[in-house]
A protein has these predicted regions:
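Alpha-helical cap/lid subdomain in secreted, periplasmic
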Residues: 3, 63, 81-211
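Short gly/ser/thr-rich secondary-structure transition/capping motifs
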Residues: 14, 78-81
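Bacterial N-terminal signal peptides that target proteins for export
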Residues: 1-13
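Serine-esterase "nucleophile elbow" of acetyl-processing enzymes
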Residues: 25-73, 83-92
Length: 211
């Protein structure tokens, strides 16, 4: 009698565990990418940018993850901030990748404002139940060592204060190599198609940790 009860109890637990496992596996996940031209396929054939390659990699790994690319060329952190609430409500992402800030620096916007916008977007994403990955950027040496250091530090400060994931330099292995020019379009600002897999390889390990 005791054996029969124990056996039925174990079977019930196994069935429940299987049900929960299936439920979790079936739970849809959505990654929202909020970025600028580096994520919007500027100057590239459609479907060749790192975000499109991310979709392909997730599919190859049979991960049920939907990717929404809400990136716009020329976007600043202020622009991203103004659009974020509507994007969160519409797509209800489980993960948000924020790739913004480069255009703020190129336009000479105040660093304090950039940091405040990044913090706000991170906080709102977290309040919506999403896990956040910040993609850090660095400026060329001609902007000055002090400015470059302070700009790069913004991303570290936000990630640390908000306790979110950080990729310190999105263009590592692309913009910081001796022959970097070959990986950039003629404007020397936007990476080529050849650089996109390298950019994804930078993002992937950090994203995979929080998926």
């Amino acid at each position: 009698m005791k054996f029969s009860f124990l056996r039925r109890y174990c079977i019930a637990l196994a069935l429940l565990g299987g049900f929960l496992g299936l439920s979790q596996a079936a739970t849809p996940r959505t990654v929202l990418v909020l970025g600028d031209s580096l994520s919007a396929e500027y100057g590239l054939p459609r479907g060749s940018g790192w975000v499109a390659l991310l979709e392909q990699r997730l599919a190859a790994e049979k991960q049920a993850v939907r990717v929404v690319n809400a990136s716009i060329s020329g976007e600043t952190t202020f622009g991203g901030r103004s659009r974020l609430a509507a994007l969160l409500a519409q797509h209800q992402p489980t993960h948000v990748i924020i790739e913004l800030g480069g255009n703020d620096a190129l336009r000479g916007l105040a660093l304090d404002a950039t940091r405040a916008n990044l913090e706000w977007m991170t906080q709102q994403s977290k309040k919506a139940g999403a896990r956040v990955l910040l993609l850090g950027m660095q400026m060329p040496p001609n902007y000055g060592a002090d400015y470059g250091r302070r700009f790069a530090g913004l991303f570290q400060q936000v990630a640390r204060s908000e306790k979110v994931a950080l990729l310190p330099f999105f263009l590592k292995g692309v913009a910081d190599i001796p022959d970097a020019q070959r990986l950039f379009q003629s404007d020397r600002i936007h990476p080529t198609s050849e650089a996109q897999p390298l950019m994804l390889d930078n993002v992937w390990p950090e994203l995979k940790k929080i998926l």
